[in-house]
Design a protein with these regions (language model features):
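Short, well-structured alpha-helical segments in soluble
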Residues: 1-3
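Adenosyl-5′-phosphate
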Residues: 5-11, 38, 42-251
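Short acidic/histidine-rich active-site segments
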Residues: 7-23
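A mobile, often basic/glycine-rich helix-loop segment
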Residues: 20-45
Length: 251
């Protein structure tokens, strides 16, 4: 919204992590969970364990019958990325690119830009750059000994004496969701989720919501999940049941 007041275009670095090897925390954990004898299924499961912030231990109990949640269907979706002659880390690259980037980050960012009538400038996601980046050898993307990624991009920055602007460690974009939960996140979730439309319509398990929503000492994974459910509920009321105005302010 702020960018809209300054320009009709928004520059984005989307694709940098997926194409040039930026998710070093994931690569390191994946390598500790797998070995040369790991099967494609075992690697798919290990890959999911590298996304611990995106799930809760009792994930399968969160969904209602209408969602038809199944770990087996998720494994089936992922296993192809790990059933090929690529090296283990290159398999993770493949899964990352075909997962969150294509079906999460890119669609969401596009919708947000469309909402504010803006256009994205994403040079790393041009056809030419994607084609080029996919052919870069692994040793020019990730150093597993030092656990440093984006080696080609770092070399480019060094060439122009700009490497001091970055750190060797991958810094994720993180919001302190626990503080958000304690300040007003929990009360908002209670307001919208205790009698939620997504639970009434069978997408989310009402018993799961009731079990955790009043707890004050929730693990951050549950906090993150509740905030995600709040977003789902708001979207559902806006576009499915249509009993909520787009001008409504959450307070």
């Amino acid at each position: 919204k702020k960018s809209q007041s300054l320009s009709k275009h928004l520059a984005s670095g989307d694709g940098g992590d997926e194409l040039f090897g930026g998710y070093t925390f994931r690569y390191k954990k994946f390598l500790t969970l797998t070995n040369t004898n790991s099967t494609p299924l075992e690697k798919a499961k290990a890959y999911l364990l590298c996304h611990e912030r995106d799930r809760v231990p009792d994930q399968e109990k969160l969904f209602g019958k209408k969602s038809e949640f199944s770990w087996e269907s998720i494994y089936k979706t992922l296993i192809g990325y790990f059933d090929n002659p690529l090296s283990p880390i290159e398999q993770v690259f493949l899964a990352d690119y075909n997962g969150k980037l294509l079906y999460n980050f890119n669609p969401i960012n596009t919708r947000i830009l469309n909402q504010f009538d803006m256009k994205s400038i994403s040079p790393l996601l041009s056809e030419e750059m994607i084609s080029y980046a996919l052919g870069i050898p692994l040793q020019h993307k990730y150093d597993k000994t030092k656990n440093v990624g984006k080696l080609s991009l770092r070399k480019l920055l060094s060439k122009y004496n700009m490497d001091k602007l970055i750190t060797s460690e991958k810094l994720g974009f993180n919001v302190n969701t626990l503080n958000l939960w304690k300040s007003y996140g929990q009360s908002l979730c209670q307001e919208y989720l205790i009698d939620s439309e997504v639970a009434k319509d069978g997408w989310i398990n009402k018993d799961w919501i009731s079990k955790y929503i009043h707890k004050d000492d929730l693990d951050v994974r549950y906090v993150n999940k509740f905030l995600g459910l709040l977003a789902f509920e708001v979207w559902y009321r806006l576009f499915v049941t249509k009993d909520m105005s787009a001008n409504t302010t959450l307070n």
